[in-house]
Amino acid sequence: VQHQAMPGKPSRVYDRGAEWDGLTAFVSRPLPHAMLGIVSGRRRMGKTYLLRALVERCGGFYFSATAGTEAESLRQFSAALAEHVGSPVAFSFATWDDAVSYLFGLAAHGKRGASAGSTPDAPFLVVIDEFPYLVKVAPELPSLIQREIDRFQVEESRMRLLLCGSAMSVMGGLLASTAPLRGRAQLELVVRPFGYRAAADFWSVTDPALAARLHAVVGGTPAYRRQFLADDVPASLRDFDDWICRTVLSPFSPLFREARYLLAEEADIRDTALYHSVLAAVAQGNTTRGGIAGYIGRKSVDISHPLNVLEDSHLLMRELDVFRAGKSQYRITEPLINFYEAVMRPSWARLESGQAAEVWGQAAERFAAQVAGPHFEAMCREYVLGPGRSLLSTSLGEVGGGVVTDPKERRQIQIDVAVVEPGSGASRPSVALLGEVKWGTVMGVGHLERLGRARELLAGRGMDTTRCGLACFSAAGFTDALRAETARGDVLLVGLEELYGRAMPTGVLL
């Protein structure tokens, strides 16, 4: 296969530079054998948009499956393939076996006709979108593809096959331990939501206070701005309340039922009521397995399956406690689902009858405690993982959160943002940063003292804290007394302006 120049990303594709580079490197790699890539990501992330742009730039065959019977799906695939190769008559494959064999045959070395205008040595890009729909009606497909991939690891081939889908449990299962395609993929790409900074730019919001609230509700899902809301963007922080009522909380808006659809679309979710109860428990602040079980009135062992399914679907994430082995907390990954469970579901009947303004007026406390607050913590961890990393004494270490127990005071100190480097060999585990996050509280010296106490306790347990900085993250600001403490050389203050790159943090870590 001849080496292809890397095609540039179209200007209409916002952000996604790393994803584009990964895809084009996969397509243009000069390997004379078949290559397989798996592209997944929850719905509305722009996967199809990205892959269509790739096919436009690189040439190739794009097919998007739909929900249907096996016969109908095979007929649609056959017709699309016939059109692609310019056949005057439609193909009528009797089985998927025949269709897959023919498809790979098009990419055999020196074969012409795979792509209009392509040279015999050019890679043949094939994108099969919504692949889980096909697997549902033709479960033998992964095995058929495995057979052809294995064959064309020996024989020469120009095939660059990308299988794409949104049912995360199905897509994740394609490469699982005993799956036919295990070990066959040269690319495994998960298209994730935009980070909070990219999302603010995408929504054209320049006010950090508005951007943070907006991200706490709709997250970084690209489709929500244009496809769902037709560019209805809150004009200012003052407009945010009205915007919430006319969009997410309006029964006439597509976003109103979106959280329910996101759950219903996952292939492995049957009893949606149970899954909504699990998500509601987490949204209410019951983030441990025992807490979730207690909230919904089940035993811990009885909720293992729904927790696993929600994790496999990328709707729930288990975050390990960086200070206590074996301890973990669950977090809802999709902000809109968290907002639905915390604010909308408890008042669903009233919202359906058009009482958005009244419901939202009574939800301010819940929004701050259950939506904006926890989301702000995740944003602060994202900041430390990315743009804020240069402020630390080390570029290494795991970013997370955890609890430090203070036996003397009989209390637990919650650390919202921590950077911990595990020990290896002769080196002790070290802590580079301990941080506390507050959404609606002006932070003062007391918060800093609590972090300092946690640092002492960790040092007493044998962790290296000699270069451990203390950070206070607040969306509401800091007292003058706390600002004065930044002269010490081990304190950082990070507000919304700093989080969004509008200003540098106050203080320095020496």
How should each PLM-predicted stretch be described?
Residues 12-24:
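N-terminal pre-P-loop "Q-motif" helix
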Residues 57-61, 67, 71-90, 104, ...:
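Conserved NTP-binding/hydrolysis module of P-loop NTPases
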Residues 88-127, 133-137, 144, 148-158:
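Mid-core helix/loop region of P-loop NTP-binding domains shared across ATPases and GTPases
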